[in-house]
Curated annotation (Swiss-Prot):
This is Probable Brix domain-containing ribosomal biogenesis protein. Disulfide bonds: none annotated. Probably involved in the biogenesis of the ribosome. Residues 1-157 form the Brix domain. HAMAP family: BriX (MF_00699). GO terms for biological process: rRNA processing.
Length: 157
């Protein structure tokens, strides 16, 4: 899975690109002048996530399938925890928790193992977890929130 940026990304967008790709055990690449076909070639037959900007900050995630078809997009503001500075990403695929349309879209896109909300406490301490709520998506590692996307909109295509 490839995570990439808009054409001229800000430092914050590049940071989110790196964090998200490490968290989901994917690859990160700065887009530059590449068009969609070139990005799909770099994705090597896998899905693609493009991080868009709003006023110089990361503000949208667009999720594309292997053929380059836009499946859904999220608008958001981001937040980072101080815990992130000392966190080591294990490269293990995270688990997915949450209910609703966004959680279902994530399940179909990522194919991550789904965990019921009442079973989160039973996961091993080193687990990574994406918790999809009504208003946010929390990316957690070792039981702590590492970064969060505060949702502003969701659109399915």
């Amino acid at each position: 899975m490839l995570v990439t940026s808009s054409r001229k990304p800000s430092a914050r967008t590049r940071t989110l690109c790196k964090l998200l790709s490490r968290f989901i055990a994917g690859r990160c690449m700065t887009r530059g002048k590449m068009g969609m076909q070139e990005l799909l070639e770099f994705a090597e037959g896998g899905p693609l996530i493009v991080i868009g900007e709003y006023h110089g900050n990361p503000g949208e995630l667009s999720f594309y399938d292997e053929a380059g078809e836009l499946l859904f997009s999220l608008r958001f503001t981001d937040w980072y925890s101080k815990e992130l500075d000392s966190y080591w990403f294990s490269g293990i695929e995270p688990k997915l928790a949450g209910q609703g349309e966004i959680a279902e879209a994530f399940k179909v896109f990522f194919h991550f193992q789904r965990v019921e909300n009442d079973k989160i406490d039973q996961l091993p301490p080193s687990s990574t977890l994406i918790v999809v709520g009504e208003n946010d998506i929390d990316f957690m590692g070792s039981g702590k929130s590492l970064f969060k996307l505060n949702l502003r909109g969701f659109k399915k295509y």
